[in-house]
Amino acid sequence: MQYQHDSLDKLKLGQQTQYASNYDHTLLQPVPRHLNRDTLGITHTQPFHFGADIWTAYEISWLNLNGLPQVAIADVAIDFQSENLIESKSFKLYLNSFNQSKFATFEEVQQHLTQDLSNCAKGKVSVKLHPLSKYCHEPIVELAGECIDQQDIEINDYQFNPEILTNCTHDQMVKESLVSHLLKSNCLITNQPDWGTLQIRYEGKQIDREKLLRYIISFRQHNEFHEQCVERIFCDLMQFAKPDKLTVYARYTRRGGLDINPFRSNFEAVPDNQRLARQ
């Protein structure tokens, strides 16, 4: 997938950059959500009513007023209704700009993060900054649902194709949660692989699992940001499967000390940020 927009030409992603030595909020770079939503026809009205881009930031450090380095982990949730998503390399460079800057308290750092990310996203952003002692007790979890990956099928086409989902439902009405660890897409700018686990929770006519798995695997050579892939999956399932209720949730492996976990639903609230085995 290719988008033409001035905001993409200005991104630091894929370019050689220098790391800032002092706090600099201008390093954050937005990507308008409408770039993807225009192609899906959902710019003005989205088919999901709940959602966020859930980030975990593992590499946050700054100096206290005595010059002693401090470290923390942050949970960040960017509301799906924000005007922009935040480009990941710029987020990394922004976080690194804290490294040699002095702040009095955890709360001060958290306030800067919340304000700067909200301004960049042009929407609601929540930030929770945690000491490492808190994360020592965080479990590694599994996404609830039945894994559909162990199917005895042959795959020979890895080009994105939503038409795979044509006639993808059976008459039986179900309420189920399905999981696949085989989601792989590629960065829109750099083509680097993005690895994810996908959860689909729905109520409606039963979705054919073979067709669903083939559809998921068709993302393997597809170029889009994480958030855009999840919204595309949601829209394709609504178009072809027409469930009464639908949640699409992907948790991607981390890169540059950040993982991105987009969540979209038309019936349930954003979950807590809990990491998986590959995170």
Swiss-Prot record:
GO terms of molecular function: preQ1 synthase activity
Q: Name the active site residues.
A: C187 (thioimide intermediate), D194 (proton donor)
PANTHER family xref list:
NADPH-DEPENDENT 7-CYANO-7-DEAZAGUANINE REDUCTASE
Name by which UniProt lists this protein: NADPH-dependent 7-cyano-7-deazaguanine reductase
Gene source species = Pasteurella multocida (strain Pm70)
GO cellular component annotations of the record: cytoplasm
**Which amino acids does the record list as binding substrate?**
I86, E87, S88, H226, E227
Q: Which pathway does it operate in?
A: tRNA modification; tRNA-queuosine biosynthesis
